[in-house]
Amino acid sequence: MARLIFHFVFALILAAYLLSVTDAIPRGWQEPCFCPSKNPYCDCGDDLQVPTTSVISPKPIIEQCARCERNSQCNKVCPATCKYKVCIFNRTCEFSTCHCYRC
């Protein structure tokens, strides 16, 4: 009888642990999106980028580039009313710093 109770308690502890582990796994998590990309889940749109590591000048040379619409960190910077973004690409860390403009 004691063995049966021990196995029952052990099974409950194991089930509780497995449930807590599966709840901790993020659902629907995707890899960060870098554009341009061949990933079909990346929604890449047009953006404006300043290809320089220096501070943005009053009249920067702006060229068309790609960005992610939904899941790029750059997008979280701008509100929905933003007309366009200018991004300064930092070659050291391979990351763009973006600023919003309403022009």
Swiss-Prot record:
It is found in: Secreted. One of its GO terms (biological process) is defense response to fungus. Keywords: Antimicrobial, Disulfide bond, Fungicide, Plant defense, Secreted, Signal. The lineage of its organism: Eukaryota, Viridiplantae, Streptophyta, Embryophyta, Tracheophyta. Disulfide bonds join C44-C103, C68-C87, C74-C98, C78-C100. This is Defensin-like protein 268. It comes from Arabidopsis thaliana (Mouse-ear cress). Residues 1-24 form the signal peptide. The keyword Secreted applies. Belongs to the DEFL family. The keyword tRNA-binding does not apply. GO terms for cellular component: extracellular region.
